[in-house]
Amino acid sequence: MTLNVPLIDTQNLDSALELQGARFDVACVNWPETFPYAPLCSGRVARTKDALVVDFRVSGLDFRAQNTEDNGRQWEDSCVEVFIQDPSQAVYYNFEVNPLGKVLACVGPDRNNRVPRPKEEMKDILRFAQHDRMVTNDLEGVQSWRVCIVIPFHLIGVNPEHLPASIRANFYKCGDLTAHPHFLSWSPIFTEQPDFHRPEWFGELFL
């Protein structure tokens, strides 16, 4: 899977994403026998001079938003995720966002050796979310929500003045503790069990 990521003007970010952002669908049901549910999840990706911008739009059952702090257990909520790797690096970065715009951000070489980003770096990650408070009980029925995350290139070890030709990435939708757990991806994953920490299955974003 590949995408060409356009450079956009930040003066009107919403319109620029809608008109110019590269469209993607998070629609690969990689483990249909055990986790068949597939909420609708799509988005647009673009870049500014110094950041990657990813805008997610979701519609599905079991709206859950209980993690109210950064670097929590965001994957248990209704959650969208961006995993990124500069091909020249041995590590990759994961950014996991719930509907409140609260982010889990870590770096490391594999699933078992993740290091959370410090608080002073978390404030550099811009988020735009429609919801701003915890949902104590999961909302039933189909719910729609949107969240946009702006990830500075310096937080993924990339010099914005000398961008690589491409980076590797995958986009995910999950909800481990929702009534219908699901594990969707943009670029397909070929493993027996759900595992998003597989950079060998990342797609490519051309910058």
Regions found by a protein language model. Name each.
Residues 1-207:
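Structural preference for beta-rich elements and adjacent junctions enriched in aromatics
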